[in-house]
């Protein structure tokens, strides 16, 4: 009978350890397997709005994939976002404002930590992190029906 209780205790302990390790640490927003896969692409749309496609988003919990323009090599303003489910999401279409889009964009994965289904930035829907790093991927875009900005070329003294 005592072996029976030891087995039950061991199984319960293993289950609890598994649940704890799979959770996000709310204090640091650390996740273990969050990721983004996105390839360079052409924006589908016109000079005002268009769509980009994120090949794959793996999110720990519900969240949003957010597209930022490029502000001198760093994420600038938010130009589009769409919700994602917990787990793997494939071929995620994000509608963006092409009139403020740059030729390099950043895809950033955010938690849905506030009102469910509403993107509340910058808080409480902060970026997901893995090993202390924000889950972010830059990608290049072109467009046939819109002029994309290149802010680096607009810098004073930059001849490119």
Question: Where does each model-flagged region fall?
Answer:
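Solvent-exposed serine/threonine-rich low-complexity stretches and specific carbohydrate-binding patches
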Residues: 77-87
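Secretory targeting signatures
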Residues: 1-28, 160
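Short, surface-exposed binding/anchoring microloops in extracellular/periplasmic proteins
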Residues: 30-76
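Transition segment at domain starts
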Residues: 23-48, 135-150
């Amino acid at each position: 009978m005592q072996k029976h209780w030891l087995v039950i205790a061991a199984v319960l302990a293993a289950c609890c350890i598994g649940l704890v390790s799979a959770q996000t640490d709310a204090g640091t927003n650390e996740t273990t397997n969050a990721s983004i896969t996105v390839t360079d692409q052409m924006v589908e749309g016109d000079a005002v709005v268009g769509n980009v496609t994120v090949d794959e988003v793996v999110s720990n919990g519900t969240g949003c994939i957010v597209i930022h323009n490029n502000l001198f090599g760093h994420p600038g303003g938010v130009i589009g976002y769409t919700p994602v489910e917990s787990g793997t999401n494939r071929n995620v279409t994000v509608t963006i404002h092409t009139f403020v889009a740059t030729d390099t964009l950043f895809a950033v994965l955010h938690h849905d930590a506030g009102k469910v289904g509403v993107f509340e930035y910058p808080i409480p829907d902060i970026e997901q992190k893995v090993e202390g790093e924000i889950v972010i991927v830059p990608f290049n875009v072109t467009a046939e029906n819109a002029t994309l900005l290149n802010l680096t070329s607009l810098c004073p003294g930059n001849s490119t």
